């Protein structure tokens, strides 16, 4: 399933919220769970992981009205570690959460290029527009300015190009002649010359529609006798290679891309909790069920079983609630 179709599929939603919702008793339950000495973590999980994001925002308003406190700040003061990070992530409106993840990836020493690439390469034009709006409102600078200030070279160029959101034209029309020309241009920019014309790759990958790119990839393989992925791996390296490959992966199958991100967040020693939390939270009301299905096809195990083996405590319980049942 290509990435540009993923936002209209209700069967992909793993967190649908409560059908008989009333924010006031939920807010009271949360207040009691954090009142006095000790915290009832299970009560917090039972409320917040079983409500939609819109419902959580209403609970936060009720909490403020009833008890005069900010719910997110209260949660931060009562919880800690990975569990706190997950629960607080649930409280952000979706676009503000993704803006925060981008800001956090660039603040301080070093830049988490993988986070920026993941978000920019996998979102639609409308989503990127909302993320950019939230970013500027919350941090007082534009996302494009901060990316330009924090990255350089061809990586900066591909990230800024991705921000323009030119790939989600879903008209379905593909000009076969242009697709063939693009494939020939990519081949000429890489395999046929000593060195690589990176800007040709960036321009085609970031400005053509996803349906068009699928045809380009087919034509490219006929010309080069190798996949576009193999050519990118041989012609580029580092974060630029990662960015280009992510665009290709999301064009081919966005659910496979996110399944891969989740798998490698847990594979081997240690867990990339930031990747795990971000992708489960951000996809839970979009297409997480479809990602789960793809995960099982690709790795022969369920996402739930891998979470159970790789996490623990209330953190594990909350993640499993968000993921839902694996069939």
Curated annotation (Swiss-Prot):
Asked whether the keyword Transcription is assigned, the reply is: no
Which amino acids does the record list as binding Ca(2+)?
266, 268, 270, 310
Q: Which Gene3D superfamilies match?
A: Annexin
Keyword terms of this UniProt record = Annexin, Blood coagulation, Calcium, Calcium/phospholipid-binding, Hemostasis, Metal-binding, Repeat
Give me the Annexin repeat coordinates as residue ranges: 21-92, 93-164, 177-249, 253-324
Q: Which GO terms describe its biological process?
A: blood coagulation; endosomal transport; endosome organization
InterPro entries tied to this protein:
Annexin, Annexin_repeat, Annexin_repeat_CS, Annexin_sf, ANX8
* Statement: the UniProt record of this protein carries the keyword Calcium: yes
Q: What's an example of a GO molecular-function annotation for this chain?
A: phosphatidylinositol-3,4,5-trisphosphate binding
Any one cellular-component term (Gene Ontology):
cytosol
Q: What is the role of this chain?
A: This protein is an anticoagulant protein that acts as an indirect inhibitor of the thromboplastin-specific complex, which is involved in the blood coagulation cascade.
Q: Give the family per the record.
A: Belongs to the annexin family.
What UniProt notes about the protein's domains is:
A pair of annexin repeats may form one binding site for calcium and phospholipid.
Its protein name is Annexin A8
Source organism (scientific name): Rattus norvegicus (Rat)
């Amino acid at each position: 399933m290509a990435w540009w179709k993923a936002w209209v599929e209700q069967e992909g939603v793993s967190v649908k919220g409560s059908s008989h919702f009333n924010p006031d008793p939920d807010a009271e339950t949360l207040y009691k769970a954090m009142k006095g000495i000790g915290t009832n973590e299970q009560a917090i999980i039972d409320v917040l992981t079983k409500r939609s994001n819109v419902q959580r925002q209403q609970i936060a308003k009720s909490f403020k009205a009833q008890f005069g406190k900010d719910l997110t700040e209260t949660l931060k003061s009562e919880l800690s570690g990975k569990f706190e990070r997950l629960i607080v992530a649930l409280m952000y409106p979706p676009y503000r959460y993704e803006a925060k993840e981008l800001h956090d990836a660039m603040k301080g020493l070093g830049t988490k290029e993988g986070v920026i690439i993941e978000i920019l390469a996998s979102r639609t034009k409308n989503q990127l527009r909302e993320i950019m709006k939230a970013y500027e409102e919350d941090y007082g600078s534009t996302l494009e300015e901060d990316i330009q200030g924090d990255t350089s070279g061809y990586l900066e160029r591909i990230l800024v190009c991705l921000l323009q959101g030119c790939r989600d034209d879903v008209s379905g029309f593909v000009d076969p002649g242009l697709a063939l020309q693009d494939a020939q241009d990519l081949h000429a920019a890489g395999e046929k010359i000593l060195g690589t014309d990176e800007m040709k790759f960036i321009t085609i990958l970031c400005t053509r529609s996803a349906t068009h790119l699928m045809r380009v990839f087919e034509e490219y393989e006929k010309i080069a006798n190798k996949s576009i992925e193999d050519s990118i791996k041989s012609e580029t390296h580092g974060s630029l290679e990662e960015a280009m490959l992510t665009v290709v992966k999301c064009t081919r199958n966005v659910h496979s891309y996110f399944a891969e991100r989740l798998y490698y967040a847990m594979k081997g020693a240690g867990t990339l909790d930031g990747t795990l939390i971000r992708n489960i939270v951000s996809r839970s009301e979009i297409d997480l069920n479809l990602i789960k299905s793809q995960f099982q096809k690709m790795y022969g195990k369920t996402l739930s079983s891998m979470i159970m083996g790789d996490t623990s405590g209330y953190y594990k319980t909350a993640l499993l609630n968000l993921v839902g049942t694996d069939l």
